[in-house]
Amino acid sequence: MQTLEGGALRLSRRHMLRGLALTSAALVLPGHRAVAAPGPRQDPETTWRAFVTGLPKAELHMHVEGVVDPWLAFELAERNGLRLAHASPAAFARTLTFDSLESFLRGYGQMLDVLRTGEDFHDATLTYLERARAENVLYAELHFDPQAHVNRGIAFEEVVDGIRSACASAERDLGIGSRLIMALQRDLDVESARAVYASALARRDDIVGLGLDNYEEPGFPAKFEALFREAAAEGFRLTSHCDLEVPDSVEHVRGCIELLGVDRLDHGYSVVESEALTALCRARGIGLTACPTTDWNHPDPLEDYYVAAVTRSVGRMLELGLRVSLNTDDPGLMGGRYLTDVMVDTRRALDLGIDELVTLSRNAFESTWAPEEERRGWLAALDAYVDDRAPAVPG
């Protein structure tokens, strides 16, 4: 596999994050126990944040394209000779206010446009993995949208090589594992999906699963049923976005489970509206990857209507015993908020305790598509961390 490490852009923020990832005393690797350095007495929220930062975590729902924030967008645009329609990164950030899936996807398209080369994909991926590792994320499954790039003339292989090169570097240097999920766009025709699926078959060792995202068209599960059944027969794991407050959302969840045979649901909040679907998700152990994320223009995320709605759903999923986890979705677009921020805000909104936070992290590890041996190691690290750190956290 072609590597891009030697020519990769060295971003100033990257060196800072690498230092955090390699030196933070809060980080825990499987087989090690957490050691908390003594310090001054902290207020409860600071103590909670420290606990969540060091908590061993996995992330199952983030998009490589969504890692690009306004500052990285300007750096990549300059490297690629592009001119952005904003005076500065801060001015760009002020435009990233989302009140619908459509407004979000417009912002997403602007970030996507600056990704032009394998080196760009490498740098975006490594930016995420370094930041995630600094927050003790031990493993991540990274979504990428090849149709959006192939349709712009970028080769499938260049995209995958760039992402995989960063994943290999991060695993070697930082100890964070990762695998790829190829997302297909629900609003494009099946022939387009089949074209990139054929490319994915040739990279079977690099891509663990298939998903569906982008605009949620009516009846989309039936549209992709045949392709998903073929993918399952080839050994791919399966997921699909099922978004909040769209028409027929409950039926889409049902179709994803019954027609597509998904192992996980990305978002999937409507499952709590149906006792039958709730029971089905519990029986099949289907993971639900919740993303209570906001934009750059909400100083307090809990004041965002979307965050409030998703957070309520997360609380209900926990009550119902569903395998729900917390995720960042698109941290570059979503106010630069990574997994610690999301977990801390969810704890604050729902008044969660240690048991619920550990359950969310455990659900994430148990929902991964990694080998059982790897999962056992991460869960052991989680248990060791809780044994060491839980007594110091406010009740």
State where each predicted segment sits.
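N-terminal secretory signal peptides
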Residues: 1-12, 24-26, 35
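Short linear motifs in intrinsically disordered/low-complexity regions
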Residues: 6-7, 33, 384, 388
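N-terminal export leaders
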Residues: 13-17
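Sec-dependent signal peptide recognition
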Residues: 18-22
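Hydrophobic alpha-helical segments of integral membrane proteins
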Residues: 28-30
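Signal peptide processing junction and immediate N-terminal pro/mature segment
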Residues: 32-38
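Metal-cofactor-binding active-site regions of metalloenzymes
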Residues: 39-238, 244-251, 255-264, 270-287, ...
